[in-house]
Structure formats: structure tokens, C-alpha cells
């Protein structure tokens, strides 16, 4: 290849290689901006790089040192108070790669600093006051300066000068006032004020112009502003001259004249002297204000001079944060001087001695300066501020940090499995070092397995086999860090892996195996023996710990022992009881059934097995409890389910679950409730011929008669059988229960007419019409207000009052029922819509873990929503009581298994709610109810006005549960099932902390800021398994799409073992 192609190739590759090495990228560069003198400002700089980078700032090419006023905040530069002199110039953000040394600089950024500064009014022309004569030109200059250039306004004796250019001209550019020609009428006190984008300032010293005219009053001595302490005296001096002598009068703000004969009530101690001076003794706050001295000559206008009396005051000083510095650096601490009048004087002291103006440690202005800080400078320094009103002081604790030194390094260790293990990391330094531990280069966070003590020792509460690895401890202070590592070898204990289940089942007449394995420091020998010491039958073999039954017999049942042993650790035993069982099979399985509305449905289910199986039904996503089914449903002893007076909402999938101590099986079938078709009286043109109709009727009747005969035969047989059983089992005088024989119910030994009719409906045959006994939903929900007897008020919600009441006849079979009543007392349209939304939600939901809507009172205002209530009240109070230290109030402590069960029930209720396309919006422990049987129901008490007011935050004209809300719900008003999932994660955290307030150490505004920044996370509760905390964290995923569904949550909680630590 020639030289020219090589040159071209090199020219193409070099930019690519250079681009590949430029790993540092500015995500946000500083930009020039406006700033106000003495106000806060921030130059932002954000860097992205694969390696650690060091970010610092330059001002006009010189590195910027941190001070109290100007300091680095992360990678940005923060200004507590912008200074137009010290902060003028070009700032640059510089990022240096600590690994490669690469350095990247941002573009220049500067401040356009806006300011205004007061100054005096001075005579510019003529050269001196003595040269001022009538008819001469007089020019005054206002020495107020600022940026941008201010606009000026001139005053004579406190009155703004008009724009009349015949007597004077104003030059804003030169800041001049020119009087041409000057006359006695121009005499007076001249002042100026100016304003710009920063603010306004007035002249600090005014000019008294006196143009000679003996009859005009001229100022000889003008009063000055006075600042005095409370109860001290104040003196104003004021003199005029004229021929004849002028009059002089003092007035206060309310224009009331002050004389020695007549004084205002609040100036009883005022004295006016013959020379015109005004004395105020024992000054009170009410005496502060503007005093005017008015001089009037024989001719000319009156001259009004003003002076203000201020009471001295001084504010409290802001406290210091403790400061930690590194030896050898230059450090500065600025004293936050308090506001005061007059301006307080500030000085620093150390050990009661004021600091000098020069030296290694000295005071410069408000700053405490350490030219080169040393370890001996550690101590308490005091900033003092003082004026006429008193003195203030604040201490700052300064610590000079040192690099840690070793007291005891971690050592390679052998730790026994299952016992506590310790690794020591003992160091000393100033301040006390911070110690962190790493396991396999991964940071160890404290949880139920690991603890780091205050002296740096790592405790492994229960050593596991996989804890055998490399550990590293790092001890650090701001001055630096040291580290050391140690390897842990775990001495494994002799144990079964896994322990055999103490009770196991084998299927009769089938092949079966029972495994048993163990591990230890040396591989153990594993064998099986019968518990009674007898030898194993010849058809049973023991193959290295696996018990093999070629064909299980009844005699194989019994107690067996697995023995594992090795030489150094001895032996361990596990006892197993083997049961020989006939696994469950279904004799009769439920079939797809179609039933007319208002009729009776029969779902047959029979199972067999040994031990005899028990049958349960599951319908509409909940287990049907035989004791709580109500009059419409009944489960017979043989397992069949009958539903009377069926309604469309009974449609759905029904599951028959058969189980015994050895196995469980289930089968399901759908139930469809349809409207009964209307039969036409007259034949249409398409009607079948008469003989076809007769043939159809004959076949139908014949089939029905045959079926009835078969059913009656079975009923007669089963009736005798059941009567015999009842005679054997039932106590004397007990009423026989309704039973079901192969799906046919009996009442007092007679077949039910409803069941006979149901048979025809199931097969969609024609039968006699039946009256639908169900009322419309609106009629069914109406409940008379007179049947409610209020008991006690629970609190107030956004809608209105929430109270407990006794409701008469609200539930079938109960005379009185304890209910929760929510009233709608608000006129707000949105709250009325929300009230109707809750009514619709609880009216449509039907789940064991969601409260039921029992009735509505709408015949008068306020409207009432009558909801189901349970005996122990809301879950929040229950959790708090379970943690209460008062033994009289404390309930049984909650185990991890019970906490998981509580969360699982809420998840099941929310799964049902979300499957029906509803969003709760306020899911929390306070809005769930719990019974004495620990059954939890999702509700919506919403006691935001009083009881739980602290758990709500007023945001955008509404009270919201801020600490339970997802970022998109708070900031965008986007409520969804995924925002309910976020709230469920917080509810789980409440359960495991026994009802603590989420983010309890933060104010509402801080929680809102964390939500906006995406940092709102709750810590892992004490004793909470890591697996469950990871589930909480998934619920708090920033992206709603990354959060689990309630179905997944319910499944995860259902699979969680009570003692899970992973």
C-alpha cells in the first residue's frame, strides 16, 4: 500500500479514536444569567462519564475556593449572596477523569448583576455654598449609582419636583438638578431617590439649599434621624433664621402639633426647647415615626424638615451547622450577621478571646479565616453581634479531620454455620470514623442478617454456607480512608438438605419414593430404619438415602427414621410418618348449567378417596363459607351446591374443591343465568304441522316421566339411607338438615318442586312459568332512614359526617346489624360525583375482602350510604394497638405469617376491585376494616377532616393522601390501578411497621419534593423479609408499567413462607 492511502486512512481513523476516548459529556452546561446583588443564584453543571470524575470551577481562569457565600453544591456552583465585585467575570465548569486524566471545560458563563447603592446629594456648582446668591445657577448631583442605570426623582422638603423646566432641569444621565436662576423660593432640603430593576434607594445625605432673602426662613440646623434603645431619650435639633425671626413648630406623623402646653396623648414626655430642639424621654414603640420641623418666615413658603425616630432592634442569629475541615487547607467560616438597627457590629471569639485582624487564625469582615488550619484548631468558636438593642451570639463547632488509624484489622476467620459470626474493623480518628462493609465487592446493607455496631464490628446473626467469601471494611473520615479485607470460611453443620417432611402420603398400590439427603463438613452416610426397630420389608429398598417402595401396601404405613452420620460430627435423625392413601377422584363432576332467572340451579359434585375428602365451593373469586351463605345458597353433605332464586350476577365459573390430608383436586363448570323466553299463544305461519307437534310433546313428556321415575327411585333409596345415618349420628330432638342425593334436594322427605322445575330449565325444556321474586337494584338498595339508630360518630370525611349505627332488617336473618354510614353533606359538585362513584363501586363489587353496600337513604338530605362494618374497626388502629406497650391494651403480637395474611387479603380485594375496572384512589390501612377473625375488608372511610387529618395534605384545592400517592397521581392527577398498586406498597409498609406514618421524619413539602425528584422511598421495616421488601420496591417503581398487577401481588404473597429471609 502506498504512502498516500496510508495518510488518508490515518486521517479518517484519528477523529474516530479521539471521539471514542472523549468519555466525559456535559449533560447541562452553565449559562449566563441575570442575578441580583446579595441574592441567591446557582450555576448548574451536570456531567456524565463512565469513570469517576472530579468537578471544580474556574473564575477568570483561577480555581474557585469554597466559602460560606460561594460553594460547590454537587457539581453545580451555589451562591448564597451574589457580590458584584467578587462574582464579576467568566465562570467555567471543569470535569477531570480520575482514571485517564482527561479534562473537559464548559463554555464561559457570567452574571449580569443588578444592583443599586445609595449616596449623598452634593453641590456641583458653584464650588461652595458661600457662593450661592440669588439669580445664580445652582447644580446639585445625586450620588446614587446602580446597574442597570437608575431613573431619578428629585424632592424639595419631601415634595417631588414637577416637570416644570422653566425653574429647573433634570439630567438623568448626569444625575444632576439645575436651578436657573436660583431664588429664595428654591431654598429648602433637597433629596433624591432612584430605582431600577434591582429596587429603589434614596439619598443617604441630603443638601440644604439656602438662597439669601432675609425675610425667607433659612435652615440653620436640620434634624437628623435618630436610633435609640427602648426607654432611652431622643433629641432632635432644628433651627431656622430670618428677619424678622421665623416661627418654628414640631408635628408628629398624625399632624398633631407638639408644644409644651398641648402634647398628643402618646407624647406626654416631649419637651420643646426655646432653641427649637425637641426632647423625647423614655421612648416607647408608639413614639417611633416621622417628626417634622416646620419653619415659616415673613415671606416665602414654609420649610418642612423631616427626621425619623427608630427604636433600636436586633434579630436572632441563625445557628451554625458543625463544620469539619481537613488539616492543611485554607478555610473560612462566615458569620450570618443578624439584621438590626443600627447595623450590628460583628466580631469572632475563641475561648473568650476576640480574634485578631491578622495572623494564621484571624477575622476579616464577617469571616473567620484559617490561613492553614491545624488539628489544634479544633474547638468552639463564637460569633458575636451587638448594637443598641442588645447582643446576640452563636457557637460553631469546628472539627479538624484526621485520617483513621487501625486498632484492629479484620482477620481471616472460620465461622460455624447457624451461629453468630463476627468480623472486627476497629479504627480511631477525628471525627469518629464511618465504617462500611462489602461482601464480594457488594455493599452490605443492614437487615435481619447483618448488623454493623458503632465500633465498626460486623455481626452475621446466623451464618449461612454461602457467607463463606471475601469481606472488606472501609473506615473513612473527610480527611481520608483506610481499608482491609478478610476471608471467611464457613464450617458447615451436619444437616438434612432439605429436612424430610414429617408427614408424607403414598398412593396405595403405586410405586413410591421417599428421599432423604444430608450435608456436613464431611460427606455423611444416609440410611433409613423403621421407628420400631424392625427391618424394612423385602420389596422396600434403601438406595443411598432414597426409600423406594415397588408397590405400596397398607402395611407400609407407619413411622420411619432417616439417619445421617459422619465421623467428626456424629449423627442426626429425622422422623417421618408415612400414610398410605387412596388419592382423590371425582365420582360426579359439575357440568355446564343454564338456568332461568329466578329459578333454582343445581351444581352436582361428589368425590371419593381415603381419607374421605371434604368438599368446598369457590364462586365469583371467593370461597363459599357454608356458615355465611344466606338463605339462597346451600351446600349438601355429598358436596353438591344449590342456588335458589338465581339472578344474572350469579352467572360465572364455580369450582368444586375436594381435599383431604394427602391431596387436593378441583374441577369447575360455568353457570349461565338467562331470561325465560316468552311463549307465543297463536301459531305462526312457520309453525310445525300438528302431528309433528304431538310427536315432539310425546317424546318430551315420555323423557320427563322416565327421568322423574328414575329420580324418585333414587330419592326413595337415599331417603332410607340418610334416615338410617341420622338415627345413628344425630342427638335426640335435633332437626334433620336438608341433604342432597346425587344433586336432588329433599325437604321433609319430599322432592322439591323447585328442583323438579330446575331440571327442565337446565335442559331448556318448557315448563310452567315462575314468578321472578327479585326486585330491581334501585328498590333493593333503598333503605328507610327511620330504621337507622346512630351509635357514635367516627369522624368527618370530605363528603360529611361518618358514623356507626344499628340498622334494623338491613340483612336477611338479622334483627339488627352494626353498619357504617357515610353522609353526603357537601354541595360541591365534584364531591357529589365522587360520592356517587363510591356508591357505584361498592354496589357492584361482591368479594369477601371488600365491604358490601347494604343500602341507600335518598328520600331526604343528607343522603346516606350504608356500608358493611366489622367489629375491630379500621386496620390502622388495630396495627397500632398490636404495638402498644400498655399490656392492658396490647393484643397478641403479629407474626410475619399473620402480617403476610393481612396484606394478602387486601391484595385479593384490590384484585377484584381492579378486575371490575374501578380505581380506589385512597388505599391505606386507615381505609381497611378488620374483624376479630383477622378478616380484612377494603373500605373507604376517608376520615380526612379530623381523625386522620395529619395523613392528608392540602394540594391544588383538595385534601390528598400525599404519602400514599404515586408521582403521576400527585403531579399529573393520573389515577389508575397502577397508582393503587403504589399505595398498596405503602400499606404493606404500614402493616410491617405496626401503623407508623410513612416518611414520618419529613414534612409534607419535603415528601412532595422527593416525589417530584423521584426519590420517595421508604426504608425496609425491621423484621420484614427481603423478598417482601423487594415486592414493596416493585410497587414503587417510577414507571407505572414496571409495577406488578394485583393478581401477581396476590400470587406472590400466597407463595411467601412465613419465615422467609431472602
Swiss-Prot record:
Alphabetical GO biological process terms: actin cytoskeleton organization; axis elongation; cell adhesion; cell migration; cellular response to retinoic acid; cochlea morphogenesis; convergent extension; coronary vasculature development
One Pfam short name: I-set
Source taxon at top rank: Eukaryota
Designated name of the protein: Inactive tyrosine-protein kinase 7
Region (Interaction with CTNNB1), start-end ranges: 786-1062
Domain called Protein kinase: residue spans: 788-1058
Assembly and oligomerization: Interacts with CTNNB1.
